[in-house]
C-alpha cells in the first residue's frame, strides 16, 4: 500500500510518500511545496495543483493529512485551514481515501510520545525509513503523517479503497463508517 502524507501550510506544505508491505515501511519520496509571495487565492491554487502533481507522479493508494490545531492567533488557524482544504480537494479530486490525524497522534505513532519536539520527529523518521540524511522539518512531518497512517489506518484505507464502488451504490465512507 502506497501512502501519501501531507503536512499542510500556507507558505510551505510538506509531502511524503511511503510504501507499506506487511510490517515493512519503505521510503519513496518527500519534499515541500512552496507557495509564491502572492495573494491567498494564488497560494491555494499552487497547493491544489502541486498536490495533484505529486499524486500523478507517485500514484498513492491512500492519503493522510494532519489536522489543524487551534493556534493562539485565530487568523493563522483560518489560513492554515484553507491551505489544508486546498490539499484535501486535490486528494479527494483524485478519488483518494483521506485519513486525518492530529499532531499528537502523529508524534505518538512516530516517536512514542505526544509532546515530542520537531527534531525528535525528524530523527525517528530518518531511523524508521532508513534515510541517509535528516529530512527537512515539513517533509519529516509529512512522512510522519504517512507513518502514523501506516500504523493505525490500514482498516480505514481498505474501506477507503472501496469508496468509488460504494459511491455507485449510494454509500460513502464517513468517519470510518459506511453511510447511505
Swiss-Prot record:
Keywords recorded for this protein, A-Z: Cytoplasm, DNA damage, DNA recombination, DNA repair, DNA-binding, Endonuclease, Hydrolase, Magnesium, Metal-binding, Nuclease
Cofactor note: Binds 2 Mg(2+) ion per subunit.
A GO biological-process term: DNA repair
Subcellular location: Cytoplasm
Gene Ontology terms: cellular component: cytoplasm; Holliday junction resolvase complex
EC id: 3.1.21.10
InterPro entries: RNaseH-like_sf, RNaseH_sf, X-over_junc_endoDNase_Mg_BS, X-over_junc_endoDNase_RuvC
Main location: cytoplasm
One function term, GO molecular function aspect: magnesium ion binding
Positions annotated to bind Mg(2+) 1: 7, 138
Gene3D superfamilies named among the record's database cross-references: Ribonuclease H-like superfamily/Ribonuclease H
Active-site annotation: 7, 66, 138
PROSITE patterns: RUVC
Protein origin, superkingdom: Bacteria
Catalytic activity: Endonucleolytic cleavage at a junction such as a reciprocal single-stranded crossover between two homologous DNA duplexes (Holliday junction)
Chain residues that bind Mg(2+) 2: 66
Cofactor(s) of this protein: Mg(2+)
Broad EC category: hydrolase
Family: Belongs to the RuvC family.
Assembly description: Homodimer which binds Holliday junction (HJ) DNA. The HJ becomes 2-fold symmetrical on binding to RuvC with unstacked arms; it has a different conformation from HJ DNA in complex with RuvA. In the full resolvosome a probable DNA-RuvA(4)-RuvB(12)-RuvC(2) complex forms which resolves the HJ.
Function: The RuvA-RuvB-RuvC complex processes Holliday junction (HJ) DNA during genetic recombination and DNA repair. Endonuclease that resolves HJ intermediates. Cleaves cruciform DNA by making single-stranded nicks across the HJ at symmetrical positions within the homologous arms, yielding a 5'-phosphate and a 3'-hydroxyl group; requires a central core of homology in the junction. The consensus cleavage sequence is 5'-(A/T)TT(C/G)-3'. Cleavage occurs on the 3'-side of the TT dinucleotide at the point of strand exchange.
Name of protein: Crossover junction endodeoxyribonuclease RuvC
Amino acid at each position: 500500500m502506497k501512502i501519501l502524507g501531507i503536512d499542510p501550510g500556507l507558505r510551505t506544505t510538506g509531502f511524503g510518500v511511503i510504501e507499506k508491505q506487511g510490517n515493512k515501511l519503505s521510503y519513496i519520496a518527500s519534499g515541500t511545496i512552496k507557495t509564491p509571495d502572492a495573494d491567498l487565492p494564488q497560494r491555494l491554487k499552487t497547493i491544489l495543483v502541486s498536490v495533484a502533481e505529486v499524486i500523478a507522479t507517485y500514484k498513492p493508494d491512500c492519503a493522510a493529512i494532519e489536522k489543524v490545531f487551534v493556534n493562539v492567533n485565530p487568523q493563522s488557524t483560518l489560513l492554515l485551514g484553507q491551505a489544508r482544504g486546498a490539499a484535501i480537494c486535490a486528494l479527494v479530486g483524485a478519488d483518494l481515501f483521506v485519513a486525518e490525524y492530529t499532531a499528537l497522534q502523529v508524534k505518538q505513532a512516530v516517536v512514542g510520545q505526544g509532546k515530542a519536539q520537531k527534531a525528535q520527529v525528524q530523527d525517528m523518521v530518518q531511523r524508521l525509513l532508513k534515510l541517509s540524511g535528516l529530512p527537512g522539518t515539513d517533509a519529516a512531518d509529512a512522512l510522519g503523517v504517512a507513518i502514523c497512517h501506516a500504523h493505525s489506518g490500514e482498516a480505514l484505507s481498505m474501506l477507503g479503497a472501496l469508496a468509488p464502488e460504494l459511491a455507485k451504490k449510494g454509500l460513502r465512507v464517513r468517519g470510518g463508517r459506511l453511510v447511505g
